[in-house]
């Protein structure tokens, strides 16, 4: 629990540090609870860790999912941490690899939207326009880095065919 409370200090402790990871087992032991499979017992720690990591500009990785017979629960857990902004998931079994890759690899829909956002922001910025819509969604400069990150992840995953 102390590590979670000191997450920002840990993230800023060294320029050589590139990321942090949550240990669900240690955390639940400290809180005198147990891992349930729902992830509720880890939610506060996960939020604190990802906020600290982002504030410090480092990556954040989630804890292992220990119930190897519950692949549906594992999938839900990975979807949750992906939506929270984690960079990855620690795994303990080869059967878990494909699910993590599937969830963390941008879809073609994600890629197409990200390309539109990047191109539109570049064009609108040159015209002095700060807020506009893409596919009916309000967009401003705050969305630029996320769109670029989607494209970079697509490139790293080998699924990007675009020209950005």
Regions found by a protein language model. Name each.
Residues 1-164:
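Expand to "…catalyze enediolate/carbanion chemistry for C-C bond making/breaking, isomerization
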């Amino acid at each position: 629990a102390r590590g979670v409370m000191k997450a920002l200090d840990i993230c800023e402790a060294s320029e050589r540090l590139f990321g942090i990871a949550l240990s669900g087992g240690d955390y639940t032991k400290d809180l005198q609870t147990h891992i349930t499979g729902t992830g509720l017992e880890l939610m506060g720690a996960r939020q604190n860790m990802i906020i600290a990591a982002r504030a410090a500009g480092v990556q954040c990785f989630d804890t292992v999912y220990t119930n190897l017979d519950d692949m549906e629960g594992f999938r839900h857990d990975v979807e949750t941490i992906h939506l929270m902004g984690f960079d990855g998931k620690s795994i303990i079994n080869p059967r878990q690899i494909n699910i993590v890759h599937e969830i963390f690899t941008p879809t073609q829909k994600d890629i197409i939207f990200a390309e539109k956002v990047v191109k539109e922001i570049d064009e609108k910025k040159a015209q002095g326009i700060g807020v506009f819509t893409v596919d009916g969604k309000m967009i401003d400069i705050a969305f630029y880095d996320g769109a670029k990150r989607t494209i970079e992840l697509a490139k790293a995953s080998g699924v990007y065919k675009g020209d950005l």
